[in-house]
Amino acid sequence: WDNAYSVHHLYDDEKDQDFLLEILDECEKAGNPDMVYKFTSTSKISFPGSGIAALAASKANLDDIRKYITVQTIGHDKLNQLRHVKFFKDLEGVHAHMKKHAAILRPKFEMVEATLEKELGGLGIGEWTTPKGGYFISFESLDGCAKKIVAMAKEAGVVMTGAGATYPYGKDPKDSNIRIAPSFPPIEELEKAAQVFVVCVKLASVEKLLAE
């Protein structure tokens, strides 16, 4: 269980935040405490690929996996652990830091969502999530259009995550899912990219509908 976005809220007020059920507790209630290994890290909090990782599991699973981890490394990067502790200090320090992330990300998400609603709302050619956290907007096109949309956007200069990237081996049976990642570009570039994207959605959808 990849718990990568446990503190990645876009809004400060708790009523505007999403919280998942604690899966380890639910597994124990269901009589299957050993079903899940839960992983998290500060990779999307401090340093991508160079953060601090953590593993949560049942006592039996932790006892088992320690045998393998002990062989894999005889010493963790304690200096990296120390600098994280000194910087964040405690959980409140993590939350305070993530509010700074949210202040950067929130306007980007809201702009993309507003563009999607203005240009595609009510047309019946696309649906999308309005996430309260994390790094992605999930977009559902008409069946058979996702790869076409991403390819058209690339031709126009907007490089997106490959269509179907969220599916095992990238194979989306309906060819309809596109993962929009608004986090990286400056908002000025993102505005242009969002306009290109909605035009590509319209063009690909019209081509599909005319061919039917």
What are these regions (language model features)?
Residues 1-17:
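Catalytic PLP-binding core of fold-type I/II PLP enzymes
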Residues 40-43, 125-126, 164-169:
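Short, solvent-exposed loop/turn elements at beta->coil junctions and helix N-caps
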Residues 25-106:
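Conserved core segment of the aminotransferase class I/II
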Residues 31-32, 155, 170-212:
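PLP-dependent enzyme catalytic core of the Aspartate aminotransferase-like
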Residues 159:
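Residue-level detector of anion-binding/catalytic polar loops
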Residues 1-3, 40, 54-56, 129-130, ...:
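Short beta-strand segments
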Residues 99-113, 125-140:
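Conserved glycine-rich beta-strand-loop-beta hairpin in the small C-terminal domain of fold type I
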Residues 142-146, 185-187:
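Helix N-cap motif at beta-to-alpha junctions
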